[in-house]
């Protein structure tokens, strides 16, 4: 599933390629992707101009004029491309936005799990999943004191808590494993067992790692491509994710993979020592 760095790179691509274009028609080829009735979605957007592309967590917010927004969640395999209408159409293309300039914005999804919902701008908190999102992982919105207080309320393992988008938004399996390794924290450590110093370091690593991943185009492990059709490069910088059996960069101990809250989890058993609950 694309995580925050990947979605941010899709956003940047669409901002460059699609903003300013006006919709002339919409071809919906797989209706389940559209939350609204097809006719409502189409009627609302034909004739509208894309004015901005924003992001909240892993959600894209495609702005049309001043009053309408398409909330788009890529889920597992969703991606966008902006191409000439003459370009061959992939069998995995499920929604096509035709523009008045002859180009098209296409939504592709091999798994068909992605979703789009047309709403009035300003009503984002009515969308399931958006209304309960935690802070964006930036120094001004993701505060150390608040993060520490949130973790102190939970005795569950730190990994699934970080995956909960209510604590901090945008993290998924890859970046949770990476930031826990950078912070020397075992993924099964009870959240309320972390000291303030450990929590502060984890906070800083989350912000720094996501920013670094964004600047390297995100991580392409399987099929991720940004809106310009390019893969990310951050997979070359991963420390533990997908590296079972590979020597740890810090200590040489083989990286292990376990299940934590039903999620495959990579860590170093020497650098990330498991602690018991208080």
From Swiss-Prot:
Its cofactor is Zn(2+). It holds the Pfam family Fapy_DNA_glyco. GO terms for biological process: base-excision repair. Keywords: DNA damage, DNA repair, DNA-binding, Glycosidase, Hydrolase, Lyase, Metal-binding, Multifunctional enzyme, Zinc, Zinc-finger. It comes from the Bacteria. InterPro entries: DNA_glyclase/AP_lyase_DNA-bd (IPR015886), DNA_glyclase_Znf_dom_DNA_BS (IPR015887), Formamido-pyr_DNA_Glyclase (IPR020629), FPG_cat (IPR012319), MutM-like_N-ter (IPR035937), Ribosomal_uS13-like_H2TH (IPR010979), Znf_DNA_glyclase/AP_lyase (IPR000214), Znf_FPG/IleRS (IPR010663). DNA binds at residues 92, 111. Its EC number is 3.2.2.23, 4.2.99.18. The keyword Lyase applies. A zinc finger (FPG-type) spans 239-273. One of its GO terms (molecular function) is 8-oxo-7,8-dihydroguanine DNA N-glycosylase activity. PROSITE patterns: FPG_CAT (PS51068), ZF_FPG_1 (PS01242), ZF_FPG_2 (PS51066). The active site is at 2 (schiff-base intermediate with dna), 3 (proton donor), 58 (proton donor), 263 (proton donor). The keyword Hydrolase applies. Binds 1 zinc ion per subunit. It catalyses: Hydrolysis of DNA containing ring-opened 7-methylguanine residues, releasing 2,6-diamino-4-hydroxy-5-(N-methyl)formamidopyrimidine; 2'-deoxyribonucleotide-(2'-deoxyribose 5'-phosphate)-2'-deoxyribonucleotide-DNA = a 3'-end 2'-deoxyribonucleotide-(2,3-dehydro-2,3-deoxyribose 5'-phosphate)-DNA + a 5'-end 5'-phospho-2'-deoxyribonucleoside-DNA + H(+). Monomer. Belongs to the FPG family. Involved in base excision repair of DNA damaged by oxidation or by mutagenic agents. Acts as a DNA glycosylase that recognizes and removes damaged bases. Has a preference for oxidized purines, such as 7,8-dihydro-8-oxoguanine (8-oxoG). Has AP (apurinic/apyrimidinic) lyase activity and introduces nicks in the DNA strand. Cleaves the DNA backbone by beta-delta elimination to generate a single-strand break at the site of the removed base with both 3'- and 5'-phosphates. This is Formamidopyrimidine-DNA glycosylase. The lineage of its organism: Bacteria, Bacillati, Bacillota, Bacilli, Lactobacillales.
